[in-house]
């Protein structure tokens, strides 16, 4: 976390309500594999359950990240997704409300224990 807070190609922002941290977003910009253009990649986005105005706080966090990617870093696209599968319907609705479009799919392969 400390690395991402200090590296110029990483973004880290906390949401505070009262005297408590209630949410965060972090991500980075990276060049595409076959192009020098930049892609914004969200790595974590969370607002604590039970937080008043949770969706609004989450949207503000994500808009801050998107603005940083597109305006400050001049990325051509921002990629984000629900890879945890927590409240997926609500998360999908919030993404769409913020202007994201759904594409592709995410798969995982886990080590057997």
Labelled PLM ranges:
Residues 2-13:
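A short helix-loop-beta-strand connector motif used in the catalytic cores of GNAT acetyltransferases and
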Residues 31-42, 102-103:
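A conserved beta-turn-beta hairpin within the catalytic core of GNAT-like acetyltransferases
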Residues 15, 53-64:
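Conserved acetyl-CoA pyrophosphate-binding loop and the N-cap/start of the following alpha-helix
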Residues 60-76, 101:
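Conserved acyl-CoA
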Residues 21, 71, 83-104:
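Conserved active-site alpha-helix within GNAT-family acetyltransferase domains
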Residues 43-55:
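A short, internal acetyl-CoA/4′-phosphopantetheine-binding micro-motif in the GNAT/acyltransferase core
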Residues 14, 20-29:
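Conserved beta-strand in the GNAT
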Residues 65, 77-91, 110-111:
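Conserved beta-strand-loop-alpha-helix junction that forms the acyl-donor binding cleft
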């Amino acid at each position: 976390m400390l690395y991402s807070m200090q590296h110029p190609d990483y973004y880290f922002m906390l949401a505070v309500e009262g005297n408590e941290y209630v949410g965060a977003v972090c991500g980075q910009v990276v060049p595409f594999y076959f192009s020098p253009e930049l892609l914004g990649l969200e790595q974590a986005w969370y607002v604590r359950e039970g937080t008043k105005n949770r969706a609004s706080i989450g949207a503000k966090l994500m808009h801050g990240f998107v603005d940083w990617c597109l305006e400050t870093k001049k990325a051509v696209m921002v990629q984000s997704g629900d890879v945890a599968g927590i409240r997926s319907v609500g998360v999908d609705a919030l993404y769409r409300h913020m202007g994201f479009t759904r594409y592709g799919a995410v798969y995982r392969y886990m080590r057997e224990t």
